Amino acid sequence: MNLVTVCGHNTTMLYHMLNHYHLHMDEIFVVLYAHHSKDPVIEEGLHILEKFNLQPHEIIVDEPFNWERVTEHYNRVKSLKPDDWWIVADDDELQLYSKPTWEIIDECEEFGYEFVTGGFVDRIGDNGDFPKITMESNVWKEMPEAGFFRYPMSKACPNKVTLMKGNVQVCSGQHYVQFEDGFTSWGSEHPKRYPIKKNFTQVHHFKWDYSVLERLRQVSKTKANVSFAQEYQLMYDEIEKSDFKIDLTKPEFMFQRIGNGNYHQLENWEKLRKKIVSI
């Protein structure tokens, strides 16, 4: 099993992301996505990769906040090993599975499934704050509140394709599989999809640290993707209304305090699964 990630804009979570996955991978492919040749993401990324005895698969200089381009890199890298299994994860996404991934892969091989899906669990700090994360942080404890606030606040798609064969193509944002006939894997069932009642991957999203507010402002001004710009502006506006905190008391956010990475502790996951696959 291989891992591919694209790291751009900042490296806040890259160390924690690699630390989460590296012991379980045969090979790790990191694409450093810089916005210019002097972008600090290059030097910072190289420094973090050294801690895992890794070299970047590629260093790319390209337009900032172009998620279609990012998805192209994911699909291209996976195609290097089309028959292998791959975890695809952004650098702020820590995936949790209902059982060891090798068991899921064995079942996929036996029954002909080619991809596994899941959805976002939004992580935030104590009292709904956006904490400062460093390499020394324990991110599960620094961001102990697990909920579902991004979609209610901005209508951002919460679906993710998390584990797949290398020849499986994903669409922008890695939200769904893109099939050759033009259709996607939207919905709760597909003959090539591992049954979601057996596993619906929790994608714990550690995007919401202290640096995200400035990033929301920057993306809202980008011309690379108007729909993403509008979504990020809406998210920023909603956060501003609540005094730059996330309201932990709102029932629709379904918050639960979980200071570790245990799939089976998230009490609302079945309820969330049904909601996410309907979006």
Model-derived regions: residue spans:
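Mobile, glycine- and charge-enriched loop segments
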Residues: 1-6, 12-13, 71, 83-86
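Hydrophobic targeting segments
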Residues: 1-5, 20-21, 27-32
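Short, well-formed alpha-helical segments that are part of the catalytic scaffolds
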Residues: 10-24
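Short, flexible loop/turn elements at secondary-structure junctions
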Residues: 5-10, 34, 93-95, 120-122, ...
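Active-site-proximal specificity loops/subdomain of glycosyltransferases
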Residues: 36-89, 96-97
